[in-house]
């Protein structure tokens, strides 16, 4: 979390660890995914590349990466389209929790799923169902350095 150009770490150094909050209720979510942290249904078990891949595999019995699922969606494969629509709904619900608490100007998405072109419009369209406001002013943008943004950020923070 960055406020006025300064990284906010918090007293425990975990500020921004949004992925280990519980996934909120969204339509079609079938709870019960175990996270590596030992808890069930952490946000990152649903709205990450591996989470998207797990959702697709559960519904299609085929193991594909998030990129492969996105490519199938672009080519018109209906199962990929349905799974991505569910994913966008889940991501909107999860991001709404951040917006409801912080009301940030911008949310920056990184990692492989940030390359899914239709994600940004689809998620923004769905946010209104979950954000406690009549107007959602938060922008959702792709990280400037794409897939490598997390690694670059970690290297930048290294003492």
Per-segment meaning from a language model:
Residues 14-29:
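A short, polar/charged loop-to-alpha-helix boundary motif
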Residues 7, 25-159:
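ATP-binding/phosphotransfer module of carbohydrate and carboxylate kinases, centering on a glycine-rich
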Residues 13-14, 120:
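Conserved catalytic-core motifs of eukaryotic protein kinase domains, centered on the activation segment
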């Amino acid at each position: 979390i960055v406020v006025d150009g300064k990284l906010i770490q918090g007293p425990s150094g975990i500020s921004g660890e949004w992925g280990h909050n519980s996934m909120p209720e969204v339509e079609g979510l079938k709870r019960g995914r175990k996270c590596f942290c030992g808890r069930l249904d952490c946000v990152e078990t649903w709205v990450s590349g591996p989470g998207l891949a797990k959702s697709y595999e559960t519904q299609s019995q085929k193991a594909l990466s998030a990129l492969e699922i996105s490519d199938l969606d672009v080519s018109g494969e209906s199962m990929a389209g349905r799974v991505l629509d569910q994913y966008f709904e889940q991501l909107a619900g999860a991001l709404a929790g951040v917006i409801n608490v912080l009301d940030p100007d911008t949310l920056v998405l990184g990692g492989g799923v940030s390359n899914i072109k239709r994600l940004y419009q689809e998620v923004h369209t769905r946010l209104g169902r979950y954000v406690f406001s009549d107007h959602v002013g938060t922008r959702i943008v792709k990280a400037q350095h794409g897939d490598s943004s997390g690694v670059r950020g970690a290297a930048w923070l290294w003492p």
